[in-house]
From Swiss-Prot:
Enzyme Commission (EC) number: 6.3.1.21
EC class: ligase
Organism: Burkholderia mallei (strain ATCC 23344)
Residue stretches making up the ATP-grasp domain: 123-318
Catalysis performed (reactions): N(1)-(5-phospho-beta-D-ribosyl)glycinamide + formate + ATP = N(2)-formyl-N(1)-(5-phospho-beta-D-ribosyl)glycinamide + ADP + phosphate + H(+)
Originating gene: purT
GO cellular component terms listed in the entry, alphabetical order: cytosol
Pathway: Purine metabolism; IMP biosynthesis via de novo pathway; N(2)-formyl-N(1)-(5-phospho-D-ribosyl)glycinamide from N(1)-(5-phospho-D-ribosyl)glycinamide (formate route): step 1/1
Protein name: Formate-dependent phosphoribosylglycinamide formyltransferase
Amino acid sequence: MQIGQRLGTPLSPSATRVMLLGAGELGKEVIIALQRLGVEVIAVDRYPNAPGHQVAHRAHVIDMTDPDALRALVDAERPHLVVPEIEAIATDALAAIEAAGVCEVIPTARATQLTMNREGIRRLAAEELGLPTSPYAFAQSFDEFAAAVARIGFPCVVKPVMSSSGKGQSVLRSEADIEPAWRYAMAGGRVNHGRVIVEGFIRFDYEITQLTVRAIDPASGQTRTSFCAPIGHLQVAGDYVESWQPQPMSAKALERSRDIAHRVTSALGGRGIFGVELFVRGDDVWFSEVSPRPHDTGLVTLASQRQSEFELHARAILGLPVEPALATPAASAVIYGGLDEAGIAFEGVRDALAVPGADLRLFGKPESFAKRRMGVALATGANVDEARERAKRAAAAVRPVSAR
């Protein structure tokens, strides 16, 4: 495959083939962006009829943590690029695939290995790169966990080293929280082993996601780093419920945020978009986490930027030029399922879209849970405050209902 020079025709011998590992709502938007560039897309997930399955050329259901199943599928499909969109993947198999020259892993196999759990990326950021982070400790057993909490002190945060969307994450404020927090962390991890990170609580003014793009500069042919405007977000129990762009911040804090983002993404390497999560207080900035893929808080870019984070990712991985500029202030607000049922319906869509500047993305997930993210409302405005009010009003208008 000639990166940045040639794209083929889907379903033909000339096709440029991309396999996405993970076909949720973020993967779905990446697939749509790739489809618009004439790319043949293979979507893979652990359950049938995932959102990305519905828009891909081909769909597969496998256990992506099974290295043999993953390698067999890659050998059968022969993609030019493999693009992980979730963390729960057999990353050692990806490393072997990359080393054998079977295909390119985005951004790199090493990056997927380091970011698949919080331990790898925290040690890279704090111990190798010397980036400012919260105090932290890792624990493998309940006794180690209790000792780590005693060492870090209250309040503190516990997270499974392998989890996403706030699963298994809680804040400990006293000794009475220790045992329940351990049980919750064990239930929320993606794999069956009890390793957690305990983090000291940082008293921050706000959190941001600094979307960072590593793409080929057409003038030099070299990889260049560029940045989207900072995204502010509100999280509840570790899960994003609202985001907006741009987040107002001081020039010094923005400079420090981008320096941290540049350093950590350069260490990970490769091409694509990275979601770098940071805590900010005044001019001070602390590194939190990084995802080597589009970020859920970045759904706001579907309204705020001419090229969304998904289009930026698609272009960057294909070696094409990117333009991450902000077009307008915008916001997003999550629409939850509200009930536990397969094949739900949505009422109030007309009212939601009647809100000035509003738009919707209903993800098409086949099964709803009360707190499962089933869609998102987007809105533009003259400023962030107006956009946030509109997005929340549009989201509140949508009513998930039983289809029975």
